[in-house]
């Protein structure tokens, strides 16, 4: 899997992973992080998720990172926003009100870009990556987040042998293996969602759950 894979998905409109509404699990559990309203929230591999609008509505500043220029322009166009733009080493920045999206490679982020992010919302990034890329992703993104940063991580769990990702299965054992050295990890919820995801059942998946974790940087 490389950058062209995701760029092509957006160009061809193969974006079944995009949700047409704010994720209810975000609305249910976000306040468990107990963040000040002015906190800056990182949303890696953000696509054009409506969750960013909801986070902004909570008084937060939002920093999305997205590889696809098409996803970024669609996000602002569909909201009727005309972002200001400038370029840095991280990529092209699109800014409208409290929302900023960097169109660039999340694996090339510099620590200075993340220095004032006091929270991270990861619904679509970790599960989008195959196992061999996850440690690199943590080293590129999570390791560079400031001490005491908090996060909400949402994963999927299913028998990986029954379906090729993405999205990939990331179970609790793997979450703890990735994060425990530097983060306190607390599972807030785990629920069966196979009945709500017919495309997984249609592909032969026999069990599907989603899990929500609260993260606290040590």
Swiss-Prot record:
This protein's UniProt keywords: Cytoplasm, Methyltransferase, S-adenosyl-L-methionine, Transferase
Location (main, coarse): cytoplasm
EC id: 2.1.1.67
SUPFAM superfamilies registered for this protein in UniProt: S-adenosyl-L-methionine-dependent methyltransferases
InterPro entries reported in the protein's UniProt record: SAM-dependent_MTases_sf (IPR029063), Thiopur_S-MeTfrase_Se/Te_detox (IPR022474), Thiopurine_S-MeTrfase (IPR025835), TPMT (IPR008854)
Any GO BP annotation: methylation
Gene Ontology molecular function, alphabetical: thiopurine S-methyltransferase activity
PROSITE patterns named among the record's database cross-references: SAM_MT_TPMT
Cellular compartments annotated: Cytoplasm
Annotated catalysed reactions: S-adenosyl-L-methionine + a thiopurine = S-adenosyl-L-homocysteine + a thiopurine S-methylether
Family: Belongs to the class I-like SAM-binding methyltransferase superfamily. TPMT family.
Name listed for the protein in its UniProt record: Thiopurine S-methyltransferase
Record's GO cellular component terms: cytoplasm
Residues reported in the UniProt entry to bind S-adenosyl-L-methionine: 10, 45, 66, 123
Disulfide-bond pairs as recorded: none
């Amino acid at each position: 899997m490389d950058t062209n894979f995701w760029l092509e998905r957006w160009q061809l409109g193969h974006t079944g992973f995009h949700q047409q509404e704010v994720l209810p699990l975000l609305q249910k559990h976000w306040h468990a992080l107990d963040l000040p309203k002015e906190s800056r929230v990182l949303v890696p591999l953000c696509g054009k998720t409506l969750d960013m609008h909801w986070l902004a509505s909570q008084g937060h500043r939002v920093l999305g990172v997205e590889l696809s220029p098409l996803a970024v322009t669609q996000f602002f166009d569909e909201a009727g926003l005309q972002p200001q733009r400038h370029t840095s080493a991280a990529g092209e920045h699109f800014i409208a009100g409290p929302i900023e999206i960097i169109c660039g490679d999340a694996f090339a982020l510099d620590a200075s870009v993340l220095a004032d992010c006091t929270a991270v919302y990861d619904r679509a990034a970790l599960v989008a990556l195959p196992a061999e890329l996850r440690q690199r992703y943590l080293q590129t993104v999570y390791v560079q987040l400031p001490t005491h940063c908090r996060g909400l991580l949402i994963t999927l769990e299913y028998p990986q042998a029954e379906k090729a990702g993405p999205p990939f299965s990331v179970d609790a054992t793997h979450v703890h293996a990735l994060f425990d050295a530097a983060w306190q990890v607390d599972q807030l919820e785990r629920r069966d969602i196979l009945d709500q995801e017919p495309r997984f059942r249609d592909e032969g998946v026999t069990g599907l759950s989603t899990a929500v974790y609260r993260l606290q940087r040590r």
